[in-house]
Every structure is written in C-alpha cells, then in structure tokens.
Amino acid sequence: MEVVILGGSRPIGKLAADAIEELLRRKPDAVLGLATGSSPLPVYEELAARHATGLDFSRASGFALDEYVGLPDGHPEQYRNVIRREFTDRINIEPANVHSPDGAATDIPAACDAYEAAIAAAGGVDLQLLGVGTDGHIGFNEPGSSFASRTRIKSLIEQTRKDNARFFTSLADVPHHVITQGLGTIMDARHVILIATGAQKAQAVRDFVEGPVAAICPASVLQFHPHATVLVDEAAASALKLADFYRHTYDNKPSWQGI
C-alpha cells in the first residue's frame, strides 16, 4: 500500500487522473471502477477537462461500485444516474459500456450474480476508485463484512442512512438496502486508488492504513492488495504515525514509477 499525502482535493484529483490517463493511453479499452460520493469528484472534474482537450474514453468501460435497492428508474439519486450526471455524460464513453447493479430487479441475488459475471466477462476492473467512510467502510461493505464477499445485497446501518439523508428529502426516503460489490470483488481490481479528505476521515485512515487487518474496519483489507494507492490531504493524514515516512517515500520515488 502506497500512501500519498497532498495539499488538497485538486492535486489529489490531478494525480488520480494522471494514473487513469496513463492507463487509457496504454490500454484504450480499460475497465474503470466508478465510485460515487464526494471523494472521486475532483478526479471526474479533471478527467472531464482532459477529455475536452483530447483524452479519449470511446473504447473504455465502467462498472459502478454499488446501487440503492428499490429506487424507481430515473430517480436522481440512483447511482447510475449520479455517475452519468457527474462523469460519464461529460466524456465520450459509450453509454452501453457503463454498467451498474440492477437495484430494481425482482430477483436481487440473480442480479448480483449477473453483475459479477459482467465484470468477469469484461476482463476484470483495471483501476477502481474508492472513498472510505468514517467507520472504514468501502462501497457499502459495512464493518463486519467478509473479506471474501462478492456482489450482494446489504442492509445499511442507521449512521450510513443518516449520512446519506442530505441527498434525499428526508431520512425516511433513504433506502434501507443496497447492492454493493463485495470486498473480494474490490480486491480483484488490478489497481485500487482510495481517496480520503478532511479531518473527519483521519481516524478511519489511520485505522485501515496502520491498524490491524480486521472486519471491524473493512478498508483494512487493502493492506493485502498488491497495488493499492491511498491519496489523502493533510487533514485526513493528521492521525498517521508514519506520515513523515510516507512523505519522504513519495518525494524520493523515481519519476517513472507513477502511482
């Protein structure tokens, strides 16, 4: 796991976009793992700007990390619609190549299996973007999730529903269930970039980067990933014991190495 401490959301977005641009130039049909929430927004902004100056997404594909269960088609908070609004409608990726779990399916387990099969048929995810919750969750893999888990239905804990209520008219409108890629699914991605900003994420960052690998902190499984990059601002890095080491390592790595 590489930890990179940067000065704010803009340099974080630029560095993550650098990795995605390099991937697309090397592999134009790359498979991107797309997250929602505030963490990836600077990346999407930067990629949209680069597309405007020529970065090509026409052969790429994308897979959303998760989706609410039970929201009607067209609901603005369906994650498939959020991803379109915030990113894919701003680039030239083919709409048919952007996939998300079917939260409106009548047979949810079958929809989960179909999503796993679609990821596998695409050749797997080349680069997965992630955020992290204050309790260490990634995707909607809440504390206690199995490290071997695959795409499945999950119940949202009340704190997560409260955190997401700002996107809905009221807490009562926030769904109780989601479909999420599992921790095992996420770990299959060839490169994972996790973004965390703000002091409210500092304890979670310390727990999953420097704490024990434990189900109480789902993101800690990334310690076992062969190519995980953690991009944090100074506030999110404020609880890290080894912050100076991470700064020294990044400042002195060869320029050709990338992230």
Swiss-Prot record:
It catalyses: alpha-D-glucosamine 6-phosphate + H2O = beta-D-fructose 6-phosphate + NH4(+). The active site is at D66, D135, H137, E142. Coiled coil: none annotated. GO terms for cellular component: cytoplasm. One of its GO terms (molecular function) is glucosamine-6-phosphate deaminase activity. Keywords: Carbohydrate metabolism, Hydrolase. InterPro entries: Glc/Gal-6P_isomerase, Glucosamine6P_isomerase, Glucosamine6P_isomerase_CS, NagB/RpiA_transferase-like. It holds the Pfam family Glucosamine_iso. Pathway: Amino-sugar metabolism; N-acetylneuraminate degradation; D-fructose 6-phosphate from N-acetylneuraminate: step 5/5. It comes from the Bacteria. Its EC number is 3.5.99.6. Belongs to the glucosamine/galactosamine-6-phosphate isomerase family. NagB subfamily. Catalyzes the reversible isomerization-deamination of glucosamine 6-phosphate (GlcN6P) to form fructose 6-phosphate (Fru6P) and ammonium ion. This is Glucosamine-6-phosphate deaminase. It comes from Pseudarthrobacter chlorophenolicus (strain ATCC 700700 / DSM 12829 / CIP 107037 / JCM 12360 / KCTC 9906 / NCIMB 13794 / A6) (Arthrobacter chlorophenolicus).
